[in-house]
Every structure is written in structure tokens, then in C-alpha cells.
């Protein structure tokens, strides 16, 4: 009898609560759900803000004072200062172009021609295109392609916020794929790291030359003028790549049970050989044989190769110089035009070197599984046991942020970075746990590959030796 009374009382109480909730007199469920759904802090120390977005992010980009979050069927922008949602749009793909002061967001639909350029702060359409089949986004340029048929395409270059093309060029086709944003070109393949997104650095400055693959050939386009410099067909054992203002012909020949590699770098304007190296493996072939199915590893104007002795090296794509050669047992984990980060042979530390010099910039203790990425504003290191994300000044090693977190590094900007786990994302401001932020690119003091003088952001587009820009004094190029 007692058990029946208790059960009856509970049922009566539940019925009363449901009746009160249904009539709007009192509803405990929203508060209860808020308590159940409350997010745990994504890191320690805590982030400036933390929000749960509608779906798992496909990419996250800091665009000026906003954060652009691409999801599977939508894109949204949030305030960098507060995390508040500014706008949301249905879209199957999105990509950010422009720099810190002039960003735009390109959005489009799956298998549908055209795109819109949105203002990241308001979501307002700045420019609309109804016919483009592909879009490439850079820090200082946006490219799109229109095709009247499969073999008749026009490549157009735009200032990110421009209203008229800067130049146009003819291409006999474009490889676009299902999603139109940034189809693959013949350049370099970046090093990757677990817990650090491949696009953490955001859009880069457009290289001086781009290689467009069309029907087995590579068309080399000068991005300053739109001139098509070469239309090259690779040999049977070759792979073509455009790096550092050069056309690379990478040969892999099978003999005696191994692969023999040779690199010939040519000036696309003249076709003459600029440099060559034999015996360097750029990791273009898989382990099953010598068939080259991948772009060479590298970043912007530099290449990553492995010598016959098994040591890794960083090579200047323009003149073929060895900018860094690792010691036996060291492992390169991140590289750009300025620096190389490698894991020491003892697997207990990460070492930063300035390319083209013997100077060690800094050393930091890590575990044997640590990964890293270099961005214009910070070097990001992801470590395990304990699980940490660390951002440091790439030149000095000064700590900008140190987080105890299982989250991933999704995007890095001038003043901080976005971290995320699942649908949760949060903003970490640099300086909260360390020094101030690194200077943005273009403020001087940033050498090109193996260089020792300051480069502006415009200089980044001139090639490592300014080979594609005129001498401001009116002299010879160089």
C-alpha cells in the first residue's frame, strides 16, 4: 500500500507540473535543459568567449573583426570581440578572401554555378556572379573562372572588394569538382598536424605564378598580368609543379628496386633551366612505386625534400639553394618562407630555425607526438600528455597563449586564435597568458626564403628574389 501511495503521488506531481507548463503558469524544463546542455569550459585558462554553433565547423577563418564559420549546409559570422552571431546564410561552401582590413566571404551552392561576395560584418552582398564555375581566394586577390563550354574558359582576377576585373586570361578548361571554392592547382602540399586545422593561417597572398591543370597539361599564369607563360605537358615519368616563380619538372624513374628522382626548375618566361638537383625525394610518389600522384611537400616558395642519406632539407624554389638541412633523426614539422620548425632527434623538443642561416631562434620542450603550424602571426604547437595548445612568436619563441585543452586550433589572427572541439568554439586573446602578438605581415623585418632584409606584403608576390617585380629605381629586375 505504501509503495502504491508513493507511486501515485509521483504521478500526480508529474501531472501537475505538466499542466502548469502547458498553461504557461510555470515551466521548469527550459532551465532544466539549460543545466543539462551547459557547456564545459573549452580550455584552461578560460577563453574570452565560447559558443556552440549549429553544426560541426568545416572551416573557421578570422576575417577582420569577425569569425566566419563554414558548416556543411550553412555559413555564419560572429563578432570576434563577443562571439555574438552577426548573420547566417544557407550555403554549401564558403571561402574568405582579402586581408585584415578588406575581407570578403565568397559563398555558393553545390553543383550550382555562380557565387556571392558577402561583407563579413553584415552579411550584405557586395557582388554577385551567376556563371562562375570555380573561385580561388587569396589575401590580396580573388580569381574566378567562367566557361562557355568545356574547352573555352576565362580566368578573371579581382581585387577582393573590386567591382571590375583587374585582368582576364583564356584557359582551355578548368578542373572545378563538386565544390567551387579553391580547386586544386599544381603547387606545394603542406605539412599537416593533428589538432591544428590545415587552414589555420587563413588566406595567403597569391603566388607570383599559378599552375592550372587542364587535360593532363599545366598552364602557367602570371598573377600580376594574367599572361599565360607556358602550356606544358609532363613526360611519362614526370610531375609538374609551379613553386617560387619556377616550373618544376620532377622525374621519378624506377630502377634496381628503388626510385631515382631528379628535379629540373625552369624559368616559365624563357623555358631555360634555372637549377637542377638529382637524388632529392620531394615525396611526390607513394610507397607502392614511382608513380607520382602528389604535389611536392613545401610552402609558398620553398620545397621539402629528403636526400639519399635520409635527411630532410628545405629548398629555395627559385634558385635551388639548400635553406636548411636536418641532422640525422630530426623531423621537420612546419615550414614557411621564413622559418623551419623541427622535432629534435631526442623527440623531446621543437627547435625553430631561420631559413638560410645557421641561427637557432628558440627551443621548446615537447612530447614525441607534438605537431605545429606556422602562420603570419604565431607558431602554433599542439602537444599531448598533457594535452596543450601553445602559440608563440615565431621569431623569439615568446609565449602568446598557453592552453590546457583537448580542443583543436582552428584559426589564427593578429590578436588571438579560435579553438574548437565538436560544435564548441572559443576565442583566445594573445597576451592573456604570455607576451603581445606577433607583428602582422607587411610591417617589415620579414625576410623571404634565405633573405635577410625586410619584405612588405606586396614583396611576397614578387618571388623570393623579386624576380617578378620591377626595380623601383628603374634598373634591371632582380
Specify the residue positions occupied by each region the protein language model found.
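Secretory-pathway ectodomains
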Residues: 1-478
Amino acid at each position: 500500500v505504501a509503495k502504491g501511495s508513493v507511486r501515485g503521488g509521483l504521478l500526480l506531481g508529474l501531472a501537475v507540473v505538466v499542466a502548469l507548463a502547458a498553461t504557461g503558469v510555470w515551466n521548469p524544463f527550459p532551465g532544466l535543459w539549460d543545466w543539462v546542455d551547459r557547456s564545459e569550459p573549452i580550455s584552461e585558462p578560460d577563453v574570452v568567449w565560447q559558443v556552440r554553433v549549429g553544426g560541426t565547423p568545416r572551416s573557421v577563418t578570422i576575417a577582420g573583426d569577425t569569425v566566419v564559420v563554414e558548416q556543411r549546409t550553412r555559413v555564419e559570422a560572429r563578432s570576434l570581440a563577443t562571439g555574438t552571431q552577426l548573420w547566417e546564410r544557407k550555403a554549401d561552401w564558403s571561402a574568405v578572401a582579402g586581408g585584415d582590413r578588406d575581407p570578403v566571404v565568397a559563398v555558393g551552392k553545390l553543383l550550382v554555378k555562380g557565387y556571392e561576395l558577402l561583407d563579413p560584418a553584415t552579411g550584405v552582398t557586395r557582388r554577385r556572379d551567376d556563371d562562375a564555375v570555380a573561385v580561388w581566394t587569396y589575401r590580396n586577390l580573388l580569381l574566378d573562372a567562367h566557361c562557355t563550354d568545356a574547352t573555352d574558359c576565362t580566368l578573371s582576377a579581382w581585387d577582393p572588394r573590386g567591382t571590375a576585373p583587374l585582368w582576364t586570361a583564356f584557359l582551355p578548361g578548368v578542373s572545378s569538382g563538386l565544390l567551387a571554392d579553391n580547386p586544386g592547382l599544381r603547387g606545394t602540399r603542406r605539412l599537416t598536424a593533428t589538432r591544428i586545422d590545415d587552414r589555420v593561417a587563413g588566406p595567403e597572398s597569391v603566388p607570383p605564378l599559378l599552375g592550372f591543370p587542364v587535360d593532363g597539361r599545366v598552364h602557367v599564369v602570371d598573377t600580376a598580368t594574367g599572361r599565360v607563360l607556358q602550356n606544358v605537358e609532363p613526360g611519362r615519368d614526370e610531375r609538374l609543379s609551379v613553386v617560387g616563380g619556377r616550373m618544376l619538372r620532377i622525374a621519378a624513374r624506377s630502377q634496381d628496386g628503388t626510385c631515382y628522382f631528379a628535379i629540373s626548375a625552369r624559368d616559365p618566361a624563357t623555358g631555360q633551366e634555372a637549377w637542377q638537383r638529382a637524388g632529392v625525394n620531394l615525396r611526390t610518389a607513394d610507397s607502392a612505386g614511382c608513380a607520382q600522384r602528389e604535389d611536392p611537400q613545401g610552402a609558398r616558395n620553398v620545397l621539402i625534400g629528403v636526400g639519399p642519406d635520409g635527411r630532410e632539407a628545405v629548398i629555395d624554389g627559385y634558385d635551388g639553394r639548400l635553406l636548411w638541412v636536418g641532422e640525422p633523426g630530426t623531423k621537420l614539422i612546419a615550414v614557411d618562407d621564413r622559418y623551419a620548425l623541427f622535432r629534435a632527434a631526442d623527440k623531446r623538443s621543437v627547435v625553430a630555425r631561420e631559413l638560410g642561416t645557421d641561427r637557432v631562434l628558440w627551443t621548446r620542450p615537447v612530447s614525441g607526438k607534438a605537431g605545429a603550424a606556422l602562420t603570419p602571426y604565431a607558431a602554433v604547437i599542439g602537444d599531448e600528455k598533457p594535452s596543450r595548445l601553445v602559440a608563440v612568436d615565431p621569431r623569439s619563441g615568446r609565449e602568446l597563449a598557453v592552453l590546457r585543452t583537448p580542443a583543436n586550433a582552428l584559426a589564427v589572427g593578429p590578436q588571438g586564435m579560435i579553438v574548437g572541439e565538436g560544435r564548441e568554439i572559443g576565442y583566445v586573446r594573445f597576451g592573456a597568458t604570455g607576451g603581445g602578438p606577433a607583428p602582422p605581415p607587411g610591417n617589415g623585418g620579414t625576410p623571404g626564403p634565405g633573405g635577410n632584409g625586410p619584405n612588405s606584403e606586396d614583396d611576397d608576390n614578387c618571388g623570393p628574389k623579386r624576380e617578378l617585380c620591377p626595380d623601383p629605381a628603374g634598373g634591371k629586375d632582380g
